[in-house]
């Protein structure tokens, strides 16, 4: 906002009142809103609070803006801020596509991608992660192991083409937290444990693309101690109207449920780390 109408602040003697900045104080009477360029943080936060259709429309519109780096198929922190004043913050001081300015800040991009799956944009989510998640990148471009995250990647607006897509400052950043949240949404459906009618419920409601199943199976570790294997020989995805559905859940070869949840004492046993393996079958 810019102050377009204001009056100086003076004391009882008419002398200017000076602030701790060494400048005269003023009482603003009117502001003018000056829109900033697009920043990814807006849709990353908003997408989690709207319905699926609104989220889908938002996804399409964001992808049509300069927030989307077409060369890298990844999302930048903002569109060009070249016309912004330095008053808008330190990000303006950096070279475009570097550090905080128009780069692929991994934590923010992952936050946006997580919002996709939470909003029910499963097809859009899987189309995005095969290009934007670090394990899917070309290691030669990324410049380091694709098993580790970076603070940021230089985007294609950087004047040095040799570093486009290269990761800088490898560390355990906020992107790791967002990745764990994505993993939970994919493997369990987000609500791992719930409480229904006075009983603990362990829910199996994965949102998995069919290509994630290797010979009809995918295995992951739950709560650090329990290996969960999904058996899906249908060739179907596990989300949407035509998804494969859970037919039974087995522990030690014994069927403990005929739907996608374990209820009561057995759910408590799993939560307490006393179960080493669970097999979930789809049909």
Label the predicted regions:
Residues 1-283:
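Acidic, mature catalytic/reactive cores of soluble proteins
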């Amino acid at each position: 906002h810019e102050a377009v109408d204001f009056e100086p602040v003076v004391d009882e003697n008419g002398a200017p009142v000076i602030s701790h900045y060494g400048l005269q104080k003023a009482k603003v009477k009117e502001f003018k809103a000056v829109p900033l360029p697009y920043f990814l943080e807006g849709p990353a936060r908003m997408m989690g609070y709207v319905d699926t259709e609104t989220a889908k429309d938002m996804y399409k519109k964001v992808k049509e803006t300069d927030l989307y780096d077409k060369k890298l198929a990844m999302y930048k922190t903002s569109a060009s801020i070249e016309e912004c004043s330095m008053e808008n913050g330190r990000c303006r001081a950096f070279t475009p596509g570097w550090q905080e300015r128009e780069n692929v800040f991994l934590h923010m991009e992952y936050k946006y991608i997580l919002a996709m799956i939470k909003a029910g944009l499963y097809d859009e989510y899987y189309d995005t992660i095969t290009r934007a998640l670090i394990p899917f990148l070309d290691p030669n471009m990324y410049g380091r192991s694709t098993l580790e995250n970076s603070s940021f990647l230089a985007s294609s607006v950087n004047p040095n083409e040799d570093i486009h897509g290269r990761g800088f400052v490898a560390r355990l950043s906020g992107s790791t937290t967002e990745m764990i949240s994505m993993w939970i949404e994919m493997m369990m459906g987000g609500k791992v444990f719930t409480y229904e009618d006075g009983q603990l419920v362990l829910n199996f409601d994965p949102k998995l693309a069919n290509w994630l199943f290797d010979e009809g199976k995918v295995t992951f570790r739950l709560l650090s101690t329990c290996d969960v294997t999904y058996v899906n020989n249908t060739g179907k995805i596990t989300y949407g109207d035509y998804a494969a559905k859970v037919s039974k859940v087995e522990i030690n070869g014994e069927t403990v449920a005929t739907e996608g949840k374990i209820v009561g004492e057995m759910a408590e046993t799993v939560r307490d780390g006393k179960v080493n393996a669970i097999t979930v079958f789809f049909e």
